[in-house]
């Protein structure tokens, strides 16, 4: 699920949810996405 959310624009039905998910990834991995 992580990989799917990171790379696939086709699977992003809600962009807001994807943005929130990326923010959580930044906090979790301490990365600059």
UniProtKB/Swiss-Prot annotation:
Pfam families: MKRN1_C
InterPro entries: MKRN1_C
Protein name: Putative makorin-5
Originating gene: MKRN9P
């Amino acid at each position: 699920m992580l990989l799917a959310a990171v790379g696939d624009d086709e699977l992003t039905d809600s962009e807001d949810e994807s943005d929130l998910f990326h923010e959580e990834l930044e906090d979790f991995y301490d990365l600059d996405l």
